[in-house]
Swiss-Prot record:
This is Protein Abitram. InterPro entries: Abitram, GCV_H/Fam206, Single_hybrid_motif. Keywords: Actin-binding, Cell projection, Nucleus. Actin-binding protein that regulates actin polymerization, filopodia dynamics and increases the branching of proximal dendrites of developing neurons. GO terms for molecular function: actin filament binding; actin monomer binding. The keyword DNA damage does not apply. PANTHER family: PROTEIN ABITRAM. It holds the Pfam family GCV_H. The lineage of its organism: Eukaryota, Metazoa, Chordata, Craniata, Vertebrata. GO terms for cellular component: dendrite; filopodium tip; growth cone; lamellipodium; nuclear speck; nucleus.
Length: 173
């Protein structure tokens, strides 16, 4: 499946946000939920990696010595072979030129359908087109959990409020 092609049809996606993942300020993620329940994990606009002056130096899907998201081999209608992810499962690690490293988490329970290998050779896609060709991964929630997958996530309007509060608290100090 070419997720980047599917992303072109934005009208089929509902945008949800998760702010301050694992208590890390501004490390926000976005999930684009398709009408067929597939979820595309992306960086949210306020994520530090998307701020001016940041340069991505490397992206690593090797999570531990025995776990690489690149080894995820999916086949068939039931997506056999897909790695199962919990909400806190790391998808990849991204390093920037200022020495910072960011762990990107799934925050969606389900099967890992695809990781975006294009960003390995062209990391700038993450910053230039974070909601389309610069996506991180595609996750398929369990059918029975597909309705509850967005519990605890923010709508675009709620996320804007979070960003406004951050802006007001930083300008007030």
């Amino acid at each position: 499946m070419a997720a980047a092609e599917a992303l072109g049809a934005a009208r089929y996606f509902t945008r949800w946000y998760k702010a301050d993942v694992k208590g890390r300020p501004c490390e926000d993620f976005c999930v684009l939920q398709h009408s067929n329940r597939i979820c595309v994990i992306t960086l949210a606009e306020a994520h530090p990696l998307l701020q001016p002056g940041k340069t991505i130096t490397s992206i690593n899907y090797q999570i531990s010595p025995n776990c690489s998201r690149l080894q995820n081999k999916v086949s068939g209608k039931s997506k056999r072979g897909a790695q199962f992810l919990t909400e806190l499962a790391p998808l990849c690690r991204i390093a920037s030129s200022d020495g910072e490293e960011y762990t990107i988490y799934s925050f969606i329970r389900g099967r890992l359908i695809e990781v975006n290998e294009n960003i390995l050779s062209n990391p700038a896609l993450l910053q230039e087109k974070p909601s389309t060709e610069g996506y991180i991964a595609v996750v398929l929630p369990k059918f029975e959990e597909s309705k509850s997958v967005t519990q605890g996530l923010l709508t675009p309007e709620e996320y804007k409020e979070v960003l406004l509060k951050r802006q007001n608290s930083s300008s007030g100090s």
